[in-house]
Amino acid sequence: DSDSYSKQQLDDLFMDMIAYYDGDPKRIQHFTKVHSYARLIGIGEELDDASLFILEAAAYTHDIGIRVAEEKYGRCDGKLQEQEGPIIAQKMLSQLGFENYIVERICFLIGHHHTYDNIDGLDYQILVEADFLVNLYEDDAGNRAIDKAYKRIFKTETGKKIFRLMFGYEED
């Protein structure tokens, strides 16, 4: 039922993530943008309510492992984010009353969002596309990286459309 997928829980999670990244506006801006694109693509691809809810929560929390990775290892590459993130997210999501099966899927997505060769669902595909849309811009990617990302990563019609418009990209 749609009560399980409450807007209030997502808003509470948004505030908790802002607090989690206290003093780090760049990371707050990043997950906010990833969430916006993830939601837009999810709606465009007609995700069911449960999948959209999971996607939105995963978009807010996808990089939650960064801080711990930096503290423990002095760096925060994708693999370390995937390794450290789920534990922190599991605690935060459970405290906010997210149901177990939802927490499990979100933690799976956090633990795999830099792994592109075994995408097992539309929620996962869209999270990766949204993260790429934001990262390509934030990292000031060149034309080769943009071309490669489009061909290798983007599968949804909505994600491809946003990509083409954002980067003025024309398919071969």
Predicted region positions:
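Divalent metal-dependent phosphate-bond-processing catalytic cores, especially two-metal-ion Mg2+/Mn2+ enzymes
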Residues: 1-5, 22-32, 36-48, 61, ...
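Active-site flanking loop/helix segments enriched in acidic
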Residues: 9-33, 65-75
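Short amphipathic alpha-helical interaction patches enriched in hydrophobic/aromatic residues
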Residues: 21, 42, 68-72, 93, ...
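An active-site-proximal "capping" alpha-helix that borders the catalytic cofactor pocket
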Residues: 34, 79-95
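His-Asp-centered metal-binding catalytic motifs of divalent-metal-dependent phosphohydrolases/nucleases
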Residues: 52-74, 85, 107-114, 131
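Mid-chain, well-packed structural core segment of small domains
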Residues: 92, 96, 104-109
